[in-house]
Amino acid sequence: MIPEKRVIRRIQSGGYAIHCQDCSISQLCIPFTLNEHELDQLDNIIERKKPIQKGQALFKAGDELKSLYAIRSGTIKSYTITEEGDEQITGFHLAGDLVGFDAISNLQHPSFAQALETSMVCEIPFDTLDDLSGKMPNLRQQIMRLMSGEIKGDQDMILLLSKKNAEERLAAFIYNLSHRFAQRGFSPREFRLTMTRGDIGNYLGLTVETISRLLGRFQKSNILSVKGKYITIENNEALAQLAGNPKPRL
């Protein structure tokens, strides 16, 4: 039976609340490793927001850090604006990811976060979370684990851009995206790209034309099937080798 207070919160939030205990991607998020009592305490500080529409900003560069955001569904891109006024994409965040860690050092967001599709997020007030983590070692350790994962992702991206050619960059991007979908219980072989080819090119330091040409090459080589935004991995071993992962995960 669902405790009465949770039923009330569901009604007051307009039916959008999915609590940590019920969330299908909690193993990727902050609740992982927490016991039932700790989950209840965390659940009480989380604010469930209504859907964020495609193109809507979650926060902007320069905004004060007030909350971290756990993505329940959808895709969020993070980006900065260069001195020349150009957009530079720094990441694509999927369900289970937390957005806003890079604001902790200065308590101010250094980047923008924008929905690439209709998305649902849980807003977690940072000051309250910080206070709670001081009382709950499991929570503190999980936050550190998530932050470590983000640092590792940044390091992998630097390596990707510095050592791989265009073909290897795109192969690694698709291969890693496939793995991330698998972690979330989705098909690692067939999926839809929520980002445009322009976004992918921006992220990988390649032109839109190069992305389109490479996708065509992968298709001719029977590595992928491409239909608009829909990707099917036909030869995962070949994709893995091209991406620099000799042992495919699938």
UniProtKB/Swiss-Prot annotation:
Top-level taxonomic group? Bacteria
Intracellular or extracellular location(s) = Cytoplasm
List required co-factors.
Answer: [4Fe-4S] cluster
Q: Where is this region: Activating region 3D?
A: 112
Q: Give the binding site residues for [4Fe-4S] cluster.
A: C20, C23, C29, C122
Give the span(s) annotated as Activating region 2A.
47-50
Q: Where is this region: Dimerization?
A: 140-159
Query: What are the boundaries of the region Activating region 2B?
Result: 123-124
Q: Keywords of this protein's UniProt record, alphabetized?
A: 4Fe-4S, Activator, Cytoplasm, DNA-binding, Iron, Iron-sulfur, Metal-binding, Repressor, Transcription, Transcription regulation
Where is the segment annotated Activating region 3C?
A: 85-87
Disulfide bond annotation, renumbered to this chain: none
Domain HTH crp-type as annotated: residue spans: 164-237
Q: Outline the segment boundaries, as ranges, of region: Essential for the oxygen-regulated activity.
A: 20-29
Residues covered by region (Activating region 1A): 71-75
Q: Where is this region: Activating region 3B?
A: 81
* Summary of the function given for this chain in its UniProt record: Global transcription factor that controls the expression of over 100 target genes in response to anoxia. It facilitates the adaptation to anaerobic growth conditions by regulating the expression of gene products that are involved in anaerobic energy metabolism. When the terminal electron acceptor, O(2), is no longer available, it represses the synthesis of enzymes involved in aerobic respiration and increases the synthesis of enzymes required for anaerobic respiration.
Official protein name in the record? Fumarate and nitrate reduction regulatory protein
User: Which species is this record about?
Assistant: Yersinia pestis
- List the taxonomic lineage: Bacteria, Pseudomonadati, Pseudomonadota, Gammaproteobacteria, Enterobacterales
Gene behind this protein:
fnr
